[in-house]
Amino acid sequence: MTGTLERENWISGGKSLVLRKQHPGPLRPWRKRAAQLGGGCGWRTAVAPAKFCLWYVVPSWLWEPPGYLHSSLFLSILFQVTLLETALQSRPNLSLPLVRCGWACTQAMSTRSNCGSRSFLWAQTQADAASGLPRSRLGFLGLGGCGLIVKHGMTLRNWASFFVVFQAWSLMILQVLGDMLNIYYAYIQATLTLKVDVAPRLFFPEGGALKEHFSSMDSFQLREAGGTRIPRPALIYGRAVVTRTVTKAQSLKSALAWAALGCKHPVLSTLCEESQQGAWSEFRRF
């Protein structure tokens, strides 16, 4: 063994140590040929349609995307890009100009397939415009973003994979942003409900000799009611009525607390200015 290594080292001129390679085996030439072709043989061809289901169908089950993403034009183009990746992933030497040409053909085929239903597209466009959603053709703007990001020497397989993943993550990001906006609106609504409905019940416990009456017209009033309710309700925000019976010791404290809590919100700020002034006037009188 030592003599063999020394002889091979002498033949190579002392620059490298040449070791004998093992037999490649029956399957290794096929694997080498598949690697030279770009890996487009075998199970990779069947995986590409599964990519479409994994990156679009499954997220659409988990998170409902906006309405314009359900259009037939957008889905057909996205699916044809996946098929384009499947058909041409065995040719890794194609550059970006051919990719752009193939994308133009795909767009033309998708537009031609949908030209027969012009009335449906017009009705869908009108419905999207009425609901405030962007048109389905705005989905092509993602192509311009991909064209600016990808390099000139990028192969079609890498570009198509990048585009599919980019579109899938764009759908998910759009849906997450929509959920965040919905949560923010729900938070505002819950805050208004807390300040208008829950806070008066906390600061105005039932059972007492005094009643506090808030209104935008007659501001804040302390009346000796003796347990009877004020006949005319006070409207502050919608149908929210703040008329609660409190004890004499809690009247001023609850009034100032309600004024401070309500005036923090811009909607209620103009409505509780008079209440705050009335509370300070009653405080000076007290």
UniProtKB/Swiss-Prot annotation:
- What top-level branch of life does the organism fall under? Eukaryota
Membership in a protein family: Belongs to the FAM87 family.
Its principal location? Answer: membrane
Q: Tell me which UniProt keywords the record has, alphabetically.
A: Membrane, Transmembrane, Transmembrane helix
Q: Where in the cell is it found?
A: Membrane
Would you tell me the protein name for this molecule? Protein FAM87A
Record's bilayer topology term: Multi-pass membrane protein
Which is one Gene Ontology cellular component term of this protein? membrane
TM spans (from-to): 68-88, 161-181
**Organism this protein belongs to:** Homo sapiens
Q: Which gene encodes it?
A: FAM87A
Q: Please indicate if the UniProt record lists Transmembrane helix as a keyword.
A: yes
Establish whether keyword Transmembrane helix is in the entry.
Answer: yes
Q: What does UniProt give as the signal peptide span?
A: none
Residue stretches in coiled coil: none
